Amino acid sequence: MVHAADLMERYITEIAGMLRAGMIVLCDRYIYTALARGYARGLEIKDLRHFYDQYFPVPDMAFYFRLPVEAGMKRAAGRSELKHYEAGMDMQFSENILHNFHAFQTRVVDAYDSLAESENMYILDAMKPVYETTPEMRRMVGEYFQKKYGMELISGL
């Protein structure tokens, strides 16, 4: 419920007004993060989906930057500390925070992989450098706008 409350606050204070005004909203985390983390904590995606669909609109596009768990472990090792819930320590897979992080993040990645098959998610390789993924994203967004609105994006944006 903590994740739902956090998402609701973010939606009310940052997202809903912009959507009502007809703006395009870009988020770095939204309902798919809540679904994946809820699944990793033992809840069923369909039950989570039923709950979140009542309160939050489904995004038109979502980018899933797929990162293997081991690569995520290496990135996390560079931080000064792992956050308790991000490491899944509340799940107590292991007393060792790194083992726990690995087990929890494996479940999160499994959830995202499952969601990517059934949702409007565009999968990008998070192992690639930003200068390679940025043009891919621009192309995908451009194709979406062309298809949905008959508009081309301005080059260079």
What are these regions (language model features)?
Residues 1-57:
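ATP-dependent small-molecule kinase phosphotransfer cores
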Residues 6, 30, 67, 128-132:
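Short beta->alpha linker loops
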Residues 23-24, 61, 120:
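The start of beta-strands in P-loop NTPase/AAA+ ATPase cores
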Residues 28-29, 55-78:
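Conserved phosphate-donor/acceptor-positioning beta-strand/loop module used by diverse small-molecule
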Residues 73-157:
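NTP-dependent small-molecule kinase module
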